[in-house]
Amino acid sequence: MAKQTLLLSPPSLSSQPGKLNETLQSYNRNATDLQMLDRLALGLASLPDSTYSTIVILAGGDNSFSESLKLINRQTFNQIIGSLRRGGYIYGQDAVSGVAFDHNEAILAGLIHVGNGKYLKPDIEEMQAVPLRLGRKNDHLAGAPSLEGSAAEHPFPPEVSEGKTASGDNRVAVVGSQKFRENIVSAATMDNNEASDDELINEDNLLDDSELSAPIIQPPECRPKAGKRRRACKDCTCGLAQKLQEEDAVKRADADEQLDAMKLLHDDLAEVDFTVRGKVGSCGNCSLGDAFRCEGCPFIGLPAFQPGEEVRLLNNDVQL
């Protein structure tokens, strides 16, 4: 395949036809193409894929690559590299100091720096998928998927018996038969089953009765201080919180039981009618209170009331 060369020119060089023609004379015009960088950057022109063995970026009218660095972005650079053959080179114009494109972009595009500002596109073969042939599993294994095809489609190496080899040397014979593979699979399956059985632990056998009946050891921070009620930690794990809850439940149940025992029915209430004249103190100040009542007043201990007011006794409490 003939070598093709691509010259990439910045727009400022086209304004100097004499300098551009002088540059073109140093290349074979039959195997050289010229393309403007600004047209590639704007998407007005495109390059063929894997066509050129050499790509040269020309300097601008000021004999520098400042204009090329502005025009060659990542998208444009990838398009340029796509037109370069594998094993081809890309570099800036000779005898011009400076960098024609970004070094990092060249590395990211897969180029290799070979020195003197030249970058090589490595000749890497395309990746191909390699099929892997798997051995046929044992048919008696439960749940093992069977491979399609007969044994002829998946041949195994011939079996080599133990003992002396064809040369007469007493060496260990290599066995590659299907029987040997099946034995290995069966042994591995049995080992896995035994290992899984050994891992099972009965939780009821972890603690015996003596350990369950042992007293709870409280941490120092959970121990009650003198004169204060014990308080459980927020994340208590020593059993103090559960014990305090049980004590509170017992106290609440006792209080409810006592409250039910103290309840009186309507028949248990005693009514006192003060409109009926009964015992009257000699002082006549029975309704004023104990401060005004005499020593033998029948209303001692009762609060002050209005004359003729009805007084009820409920749970040993006076209700007016």
Curated annotation (Swiss-Prot):
Chain span(s) of sequence motif Cx2C motif 2: 294-297
Gene3D superfamilies: Fe-S cluster assembly protein Dre2, N-terminal domain
Binding site residues for [4Fe-4S] cluster: C283, C286, C294, C297
Region (Linker): 131-213
SUBUNIT field: Monomer. Interacts with tah18. Interacts with mia40.
UniProt-listed HAMAP family: Anamorsin
Domain writeup: The C-terminal domain binds 2 Fe-S clusters but is otherwise mostly in an intrinsically disordered conformation. The N-terminal domain has structural similarity with S-adenosyl-L-methionine-dependent methyltransferases, but does not bind S-adenosyl-L-methionine. It is required for correct assembly of the 2 Fe-S clusters.
Functional note: Component of the cytosolic iron-sulfur (Fe-S) protein assembly (CIA) machinery required for the maturation of extramitochondrial Fe-S proteins. Part of an electron transfer chain functioning in an early step of cytosolic Fe-S biogenesis, facilitating the de novo assembly of a [4Fe-4S] cluster on the scaffold complex cfd1-nbp35. Electrons are transferred to dre2 from NADPH via the FAD- and FMN-containing protein tah18.
The protein, known as: Fe-S cluster assembly protein dre2
Organism: Neosartorya fischeri (strain ATCC 1020 / DSM 3700 / CBS 544.65 / FGSC A1164 / JCM 1740 / NRRL 181 / WB 181)
Gene: dre2
